[in-house]
């Protein structure tokens, strides 16, 4: 792709700038990070999905959005083993461009499906708390089903074109996959990325902040009208949950999108200033902020655990049941083992006695 659409800026960069000079450090830290994300993300989200499916008869709009968020996280974790190997080899992709495109697809599906479903959750909570009479449970679940289908269609429409474009690039001694330098020669890339950041991050963040600020105002008004709600601690828990959700969203998604936007603005308005040092710094910032953004799939199960009382209770119940099963099986196997050892000893004694006679 970079060979077909080159700009004067790309041509002026030359081929002497090593944008992967940090690979010796990255090949250690990034595989460790993504291994952690893979284990925690897969186990945590599978556990959340099991709990949701077991209680599907009691499903509501909030649970439905959460389930779709969990599914997008699980899809993302399936792509991580290949990325772990890629980073461990020092940014060398050895399994073909087709798999590179698929991992890119799963990456962007997780990113923007996650953002969209978190936005849906904030809107859903807004109507449930601020305007409860406008949307009863039946209507909200029906609307939620349609919205989930629409979100998936929108995300796939945005990401499926990635399968049509080469995602890998042959460098001097390696093949890189899904790296920004592979596409920086595309003339329209800055505008595409700025548009994606505005629609995929700035707009959802504005909606989330607006919805949760209105919810907080409603909770404060309710506490003033009824002091018992403040004493019960319900409002405090709700506010802590809101702070947790906004904090995770801002911490995980903001650094990546800010890094992209500021670099694209530089590319458009000060192309001459983008020397090798600036480009390499941006490449390092991308790797760091992408790691931070991907850590979001580990945080989602913890949000469910602390925010949803029913989910927390179900998880603890499952863990207790598993522990009790393990203990009972261990206790049951111990007498069997002792009995087997005693039987073998008795047979040996009987055999020796027979030989003595």
Curated annotation (Swiss-Prot):
Paired cysteines (S-S): 100-177
CDD domains on file: 7tmA_EBI2
Matches recorded under Pfam families: 7tm_1
Organism expressing this protein natively: Rattus norvegicus
Keywords on record: Adaptive immunity, Cell membrane, Disulfide bond, G-protein coupled receptor, Glycoprotein, Immunity, Membrane, Phosphoprotein, Receptor, Transducer, Transmembrane, Transmembrane helix
PANTHER family per UniProt: G-PROTEIN COUPLED RECEPTOR (PTHR24237), G-PROTEIN COUPLED RECEPTOR 183 (PTHR24237:SF7)
Protein name: G-protein coupled receptor 183
Region (Disordered): 336-357
GO cellular component: plasma membrane
PROSITE patterns named among the record's database cross-references: G_PROTEIN_RECEP_F1_1, G_PROTEIN_RECEP_F1_2
BP GO terms, sorted: adaptive immune response; B cell activation involved in immune response; cell chemotaxis; dendritic cell chemotaxis; dendritic cell homeostasis; G protein-coupled receptor signaling pathway; humoral immune response; leukocyte chemotaxis
Extracellular side, ranges: 1-32, 90-101, 165-190, 262-287
Modified residues (Phosphoserine): 324, 345
Protein family per UniProt: Belongs to the G-protein coupled receptor 1 family.
Region spans: Interaction with G proteins: 122-130
Glycosylation site positions: 4
Record note on quaternary structure: Homodimer and heterodimer. Heterodimerizes with CXCR5; leading to modulate the interaction between of CXCL13 and CXCR5.
Positions in the Cytoplasmic compartment: 54-68, 123-143, 212-240, 309-357
InterPro entries found in the cross-reference section: GP183-like, GPCR_Rhodpsn, GPCR_Rhodpsn_7TM
Gene: Gpr183
Main location: membrane
């Amino acid at each position: 792709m970079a060979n077909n659409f080159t700009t004067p800026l790309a041509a002026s960069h030359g081929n002497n700038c090593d944008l992967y000079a940090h690979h010796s450090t990255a090949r250690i830290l990034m595989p460790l990070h993504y291994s952690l994300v893979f284990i925690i993300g897969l186990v945590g989200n599978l556990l959340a999905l099991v709990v949701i499916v077991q209680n599907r008869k009691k499903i509501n709009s909030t649970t439905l959005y959460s389930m779709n968020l969990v599914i997008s996280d699980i899809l993302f974790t399936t792509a991580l083993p290949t990325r772990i190997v890629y980073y461990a080899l020092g940014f060398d992709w050895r399994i073909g461009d087709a798999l590179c495109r698929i991992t890119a697809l799963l990456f962007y599906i997780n990113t923007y499906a996650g953002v969209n479903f978190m936005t849906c959750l904030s809107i859903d909570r807004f109507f449930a708390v601020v305007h409860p009479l406008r949307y009863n449970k039946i209507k909200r679940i029906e609307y939620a089903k349609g919205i989930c289908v629409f979100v998936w269609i929108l995300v796939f429409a945005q990401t499926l074109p990635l399968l049509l474009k080469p995602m890998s690039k042959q460098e001097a001694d390696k093949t890189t996959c899904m790296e920004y330098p592979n596409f920086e020669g595309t003339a329209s890339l800055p505008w595409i990325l700025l548009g994606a950041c505005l629609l995929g991050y700035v707009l959802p963040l504005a909606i989330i902040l607006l919805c949760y600020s209105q919810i907080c105002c409603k909770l404060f008004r309710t506490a003033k009208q009824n002091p018992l709600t403040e004493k019960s601690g319900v409002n405090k828990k709700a506010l802590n949950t809101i702070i947790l959700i906004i904090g995770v969203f801002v911490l995980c998604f903001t650094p990546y999108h800010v890094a992209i936007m500021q670099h694209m603005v530089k590319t458009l308005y000060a192309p001459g200033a983008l020397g090798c040092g600036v480009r390499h710094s941006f490449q390092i910032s991308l790797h760091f902020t992408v790691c931070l953004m991907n850590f979001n799939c580990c945080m989602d199960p913890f949000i469910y655990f602390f925010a949803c009382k029913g989910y927390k209770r179900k998880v603890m119940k499952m863990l207790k049941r598993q522990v009790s099963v393990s203990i009972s099986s261990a206790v049951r196997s111990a007498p069997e083992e002792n009995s087997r050892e005693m039987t073998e000893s008795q047979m040996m004694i009987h055999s020796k006695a027979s030989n003595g006679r």
